[in-house]
UniProtKB/Swiss-Prot annotation:
Cofactor section: Ni cation
Name of the featured protein: Urease subunit alpha
Gene3D superfamilies from the UniProt entry: Metal-dependent hydrolases, Urease, subunit C, domain 1
Keyword Cytoplasm set for record: yes
Note describing how the cofactor binds: Binds 2 nickel ions per subunit.
Organism this protein belongs to: Rhizobium leguminosarum bv. trifolii (strain WSM2304)
Encoding gene, per UniProt annotation: ureC
Length: 570
């Protein structure tokens, strides 16, 4: 006779199930479990007196015969594809199955075999997401990588060589020699890394040699001269070698206006950084390119979301990041032309309607590398409070809004940069780069970060204590952050052309080099999941007011945010 159990007792034992709701951190965002792929009465759980024991939930199946390396039990999966409950099976560093784990000799419907060689990660009451991807990195300091990892990022793409002045301002690793040094350095870090070459040139030769040296993308930056000629040349090289182009346009409109940039792009796919403009770009109307079907627009996190402190903070950041002087009037005018409350307010709404597709950091160069997830969810929370539920919601929950916003730092940057065959979602066949969260700390402080199926980072107590929990508890590197486990748990992304040219043998690096693919004509704004809207944008040149399809986009700045001081008092 089946035993009946209350929802509260069930959630306490196995985590929430279909129809249960979970609050994300201290936001006003509530998810509802859409489907539970586990089987009532046959759930697997590890621990004393629990199910994953020999002859019960654990089978006699060997690894060679199909048992997984790791099972993550009873996880609430939050992904662009949905909000659902399942067990997750990992093998050879990849997700091999999502569904029902256990012993097929004893239990029905098992598609994840637990054997004597299987490790268990208990996710009852926890949320599992794909590791985040930050697609706007200035590699100024290697210490950024640990900060990003501990915040739930598992892939970083950008450029730089350290605290050189070119890197402080622009996201470029210029030239084959510097690219080689950065790819070599990548072997030291528990993180999937990808490097962008400099894209500013009017002739293709120097750009081609950077792609052949391993650049996964080319970055056009106004500080190097983003002229129509450089834009056209860079995109032509990218089309030839299947790499992405990122653009930071001409704030001063010296070589042309936004219309000239759109003309130089010629309908080709391009990733537009900080499309609102505070991070740089044609003043005051670069934001209008988010309506172009070939432009993938993104934000950097200092303007996310619009608050009472945003404007004042940006002026100081800008002076430092772009080597400007407060004693030079022209430099002050340059800074003030970029910081506009009207376009920043509109950016909030453009994210909420799915017209802006990606959120990234702009690490140490007008952005905070450890706050990509936090700023994304703060924006989502602000928009729910100010604009209410989205019309696409089905039921009394925020599932669609949550799926829209998580796509902005997982699957969409992966698609934009040709990495979605490897990362970006909780999906069978992809790398097991996964993050576990306590719902109360969702988006703020992860419970555990996995890279390639191995634990790379987690909060950990005093190593001399008798149990793992005594203070001081803080984030520490785990075993996938050391030795050959590090180089076997993460990869370095490069261009296919560089692999064909023998880059791996030439550099002798330990990490696997994986090629990016499908970054050009095969993708566009329409490829951005839940974030593919292309409204017609108008900007008033006098007032800076922004309209989308004729509707004024404006909102009040936030005075209080969730996921903030409450979580960082200690």
């Amino acid at each position: 006779m089946p035993y009946k159990i209350s929802r509260a007792a069930y959630a306490g034992m196995f985590g929430p199930t279909t129809g249960d709701k979970v609050r994300l951190a201290d936001t006003e965002l509530f998810i509802e479990i859409e489907k539970d792929f586990t089987t009532y009465g046959e759930e697997v759980k590890f621990g004393g007196g629990k199910v994953i024991r020999d002859g019960m939930g654990q089978s006699q199946v060997t690894r060679a015969d199909g048992a997984v390396d790791t099972v993550i039990t009873n996880a609430v999966i939050v992904d662009h594809s949905g909000v659902y409950k399942a067990d997750i099976g990992l093998k050879d560093g990849r997700i091999v199955a999502i569904g029902k784990a256990g012993n097929p000799d004893m239990q029905p419907g098992v598609n994840i075999i637990v054997g004597p060689g299987t490790e268990a990660i208990a996710a009852e009451g926890k949320i599992v997401t794909a590791g985040g991807m930050d697609s706007h990195i200035h590699f100024i300091a290697p210490q950024q990588i640990e900060e990003a990892l501990m915040s739930g990022m598992t892939c970083m793409l950008g450029g730089g060589t350290g605290p050189a002045h070119g890197t402080l301002a622009t996201t470029c690793t210029p030239g084959p020699w510097h690219l080689a040094r950065m790819i070599e350095a990548a072997d030291a870090f528990p993180m999937n890394l990808a490097f962008a070459g400099k894209g500013n040139a009017s002739l293709p030769g120097a750009l081609t040699e950077m792609v052949l040296a391993g650049a996964t993308s080319l970055k056009l930056h106004e500080d190097w001269g983003t002229t129509p000629g450089a834009i056209d040349c860079c995109l032509s090289v990218a089309d030839e070698y299947d790499v992405q182009v990122m653009i930071h346009t001409d704030t001063l409109n010296e070589s042309g206006f936004v219309e000239d940039t759109i003309g130089a792009i010629k309908g080709r796919t391009i990733h537009a950084f900080h499309t609102e403009g505070a991070g740089g770009g044609h003043a005051p109307d670069i934001i209008k390119i988010c309506g172009q079907p070939n432009v993938i627009p993104s934000s950097t996190n200092p303007t996310r979301p619009y608050t009472v402190n945003t404007i004042a903070e940006h002026l100081d950041m800008l002076m430092v990041c772009h080597h400007l002087s407060p004693s030079i009037p022209e430099d002050i005018a340059f800074a003030e032309s970029r910081i506009r409350k009207e376009t920043i307010a509109a950016e909030d709404i453009l994210h909420d309607i799915g017209a802006f597709s990606i959120i990234s950091s702009d690490s140490q160069a007008m952005g905070r590398v450890g706050e990509v997830a936090i700023r994304t969810w703060q924006t989502a929370d602000k928009m729910k409070r100010q604009r209410g539920r989205l019309k696409q919601e089905n039921g009394d929950n925020d599932n669609f809004r949550v799926r829209r916003y998580i796509a902005k730092y997982t699957i969409n940057p992966a698609i934009a940069h040709g990495l979605s065959h490897e990362i970006g979602s909780v999906e069978v066949g992809k790398r097991a780069d996964l993050v576990l969260w306590n719902p109360a700390f969702f988006g703020v402080k992860p419970d555990m970060v996995l890279l390639g199926g191995s634990i790379a980072a987690a909060p950990m107590g005093d190593p001399n204590a008798s149990i793992p929990t005594p203070q001081p508890v803080h984030y520490r590197p785990m075993f996938a952050s050391y030795g050959r486990s590090l180089t076997n748990s993460s990869v370095t992304f490069v261009s296919q052309a560089s692999l064909d040219a023998g880059l791996k043998g030439r550099l002798g690096v330990a990490k696997q080099l994986v090629a990016v693919k499908n970054t050009r004509g095969g993708i566009s704004k329409a490829s951005m999941i839940h974030n593919d809207l292309t409204p017609e944008i108008e900007v008033d040149p006098e007032t800076y007011e922004v309209r989308a399809n004729g509707e004024l986009l404006t909102c009040e700045p936030a005075t209080v945010l969730p996921m903030a001081q409450r979580y960082f008092l200690f």
